[in-house]
Amino acid sequence: GKQVACLTEHAQPVRTVTFARPNVSYSDHMFVGSDDRTITVHDVQAIRSHVSETAVAALQGHRGWVLDVQAGGNGRVIASTCSDHVVRLWDLGTSPIECIMTQTQKTPIWGVAWHPDSMEGTREDMGSSTLMAAGHRFITGSDDGHVRMYRSAGTGTRADEVV
């Protein structure tokens, strides 16, 4: 294949790259997580049309390597995991993009996935913030060999561990 773009905003190794789900809010975006503790958000249409290869946002808050990023629900919320033992949920609909929930574990979190029943992305709009509906579930895979399932309790609160 022919290279059509080269994104150079991360100075350290990139560990995860993912696209938003198709046919949802922000489906024209991709997310890049790096050892520089940053997640960059890119507009795929701007890259494809050679308008801009610059990230539209840089999400900061993790204190270690970003190991995984996954879009869930209606595409407005993404989950990120890190070597700092924290999974974070981010609301792409806020400006600037806000971390709306954190969940800490005892070991680095290598991966995250949304439960298929949670992929509908039910939410309630309140001003500029999004409330994740209680009951949305995601799973994490950690350095201790455990897979944990969480159910969100809503924006700004910790998730309940259900497994």
What does each model-found stretch correspond to?
Residues 32-36, 80-84, 141-144:
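Conserved strand-to-loop turn within each blade of WD40 beta-propeller repeats
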Residues 115, 134-162:
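Blade-level signature of beta-propeller repeat domains, shared across WD40, Kelch, NHL, RCC1
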